[in-house]
Amino acid sequence: MSEVVAETARRRTFAIISHPDAGKTTLTEKLLLFGGAIQMAGSVKSRKAVRHATSDWMTLEKERGISVTSSVMQFPYEGKIINLLDTPGHADFGEDTYRVLTAVDSALMVIDVAKGVEERTIKLMEVCRLRDTPIMTFINKLDREGKNPIELLDEVERVLGIQCAPVTWPIGMGKRLRGVVNLLTNEVHLYEPGRNFTRQDSTIFTSLEAPGLAERIGEQMLADLHEELELIQGASACFDPTEYLGGRQTPVFFGSGVNNFGVQPLLDFFVEHAPSPQQRDTTSRVVLPTEEKLTGFVFKIQANMDPQHRDRVAFMRVCSGRFTAGMKAFHVRSSKDLKLANALTFMASDRESVAEAFPGDVIGIHNHGRVSIGDTFTEGEVLSFTGIPSFAPELFRRACLGDPLKLKQLQKGLTQLSEEGATQFFRPLMSNDLILGAVGMLQFDVVAYRLKNEYGVDAAFEPVSITTARWVYCDNSKTLEEFREKNVTNLAVDASGELVYLAPTRVNLQLAQERAPEIHFFATREHAYAVGVD
């Protein structure tokens, strides 16, 4: 067996998705803790505490207590290599989350036991369904009162359209929480506040009939549990690996992330059943992970991960072959070889130089403006991975500068921050305005904050009369030039130099489309070609 085949089989690359405040970042911490990647989980609860969540590493995130950029973390567990991509839970950062989901092989969905399925979870599930991504579910905050577990499973099935297969089942909830029972092994894990719940620090009974269990949880609770399990095992599906890998069934676990409870069974099950790196579609062929030659694509760019070095790092998912430090790779878009020196692996903002990487791994490439989101790297073959789009923004603001002498820094800041993909930067053809587009208001706050802290620029963002944007293309260059002349007041270029129509109203956009039927208007732009024709 080749090294690439063996190492690919060891990889598990996944993302955690949830509605804001479902406890995703806390669970991320605990997975790292159980994986031995960190010694002490960050105090996510007290945001004023010195210890901040390991995966919320940017200054703004630490101050606000929300994840606004995706972190990448790698750790070994039970002979496997786990690549965990933490995603922003805040709704305004959906595009970043969408692109992260193109880089993983499976996902873990976190649901708040009291709130059930929430709006953001529904949207993220829709994205996962587009790619039939296998999903496991962790129902969190079991130490608080919440919905009836049977009703929760019914809600997940009804709202998200995916079959539930419970793997662990709660014994009580809130103040009555006594533990969980594993439906596959019949083991009972007791809940004892203050414990770490590692294998060495858990009270585990081998079955519901084990001596001493009734004394620990109470005769009545044990009798109720037997009754409930009879009902649930008769009414719910058994775990089916084929259905799970096809994205049609979700194994469900219950626990309390903040108390470390229920995390170990989840991680053990994940390592055993989650898929290793899968094949990937390109514009020309399917790439298998076990191919010997390196391929990979960039799904994220992060500016100023280290403010002292003013750096930009491109996050590349390795899709096939083996990456070695200092190797040259073919950058398909520019048709040039780039030396991938000083590539990095991550533990949130802690970074280490990487000697080698295999399919499923995410490496950081130092980027001096040559690499964009969606770019493909190979060992010479011309191909382009598909499905990594930019979306048309829904909100637009004009950047206003307090100090006109800082214009150059402002332009540089807006360009670099837009490369990360959470905002988009437009320059109208007929004015000197600097227009920023986003999908949520929070992004303008984030950009203003980062401009000040990372670029030394005080900028405000004022409303501008733009309702929506569309990328415009035409195969006939003469027709495109005529369209450009007639509509120059509504046209701009984005950070990549692509032509964009900025419509003041929906009616204006409709009229423009009717008057120029040979011009294609796109609501999303995918690297190498556009998708999503209006």
Curated annotation (Swiss-Prot):
Describe the family membership recorded for this protein in Swiss-Prot or TrEMBL.
Belongs to the TRAFAC class translation factor GTPase superfamily. Classic translation factor GTPase family. PrfC subfamily.
Gene this protein is translated from: prfC
Q: Where in the cell is it found?
A: Cytoplasm
Provide the residue positions that the database annotates as binding GTP.
18-25, 86-90, 140-143
What is its biological role?
Increases the formation of ribosomal termination complexes and stimulates activities of RF-1 and RF-2. It binds guanine nucleotides and has strong preference for UGA stop codons. It may interact directly with the ribosome. The stimulation of RF-1 and RF-2 is significantly reduced by GTP and GDP, but not by GMP.
Cite the source lineage.
Bacteria, Pseudomonadati, Pseudomonadota, Gammaproteobacteria, Lysobacterales
Q: Which domain of life is it from?
A: Bacteria
Q: Which UniProt keywords apply?
A: Cytoplasm, GTP-binding, Nucleotide-binding, Protein biosynthesis
Recorded protein name is Peptide chain release factor 3
**Which organism does this record belong to?**
Xylella fastidiosa (strain 9a5c)
Query: A GO term (biological process) for this protein?
Result: regulation of translational termination
Query: What residues does the tr-type G domain cover?
Result: 9-278
User: GO CC terms on record?
Assistant: cytosol
| Molecular function GO terms recorded | GTP binding; GTPase activity; guanosine tetraphosphate binding; translation release factor activity, codon nonspecific; translation release factor activity, codon specific
